[in-house]
Curated annotation (Swiss-Prot):
Residues 1-28, 76-129 are cytoplasmic. Keywords: Membrane, Transmembrane, Transmembrane helix. It is found in: Membrane. Residues 50-54 are extracellular. Its main location: membrane. One of its GO terms (cellular component) is membrane. This is Putative uncharacterized membrane protein YML057C-A. The chain crosses the membrane at residues 29-49, 55-75. Partially overlaps CMP2. The keyword Hydrolase does not apply. It comes from the Eukaryota. It is a multi-pass membrane protein.
Length: 129
């Protein structure tokens, strides 16, 4: 699972342009997990997959749902458009972007638990958050 996550992060790092700030809300991640689990259970209940194929199908659907949430659901340019204070912990640093867990103190606009794909050369200070 860790290897799969690393491959996804490397793909996103080399694909996304570094001139924008992209985010994935924790809500979309949880929806992706629930969608994958529900799909696997549906296929299993009608006899399409067995115990062996269940984990493979779940992994494929989860990865696809996560990639879709990154590129389609939650990508937005937030640089300069939102102001708040908070802290960002870098989880993984790539060539163009960093994968950070951001905890905001400004709960009215930016919920706690946002995960950001941030430009690597962007300073993480109150000018942007």
């Amino acid at each position: 699972m860790a290897g799969t996550l690393f491959i996804i992060l490397r793909f996103v790092d080399t694909t996304l342009p570094s001139s924008r700030v992209y985010c994935v809300r924790s809500l979309e991640v949880s929806v992706a997990v629930e969608l994958a689990a529900a799909t696997v259970l549906a296929f299993e209940s009608i006899g399409v997959v067995d115990d062996c194929g269940r984990s493979v199908l779940f992994s494929i659907i989860l990865i696809a749902a996560f990639i879709c949430s990154v590129f389609l659901i939650a990508s937005e340019d937030i640089a300069g458009s939102r102001r708040s204070t908070g802290s960002c912990v870098t989880l993984w640093e790539g060539r163009n972007i960093s994968f950070c867990l951001y905890r905001s103190n400004w709960l009215n606009t930016v919920p706690v638990g946002y995960m950001f794909f941030l430009r690597k050369n962007r300073s993480l200070d109150e000018r942007y958050f």
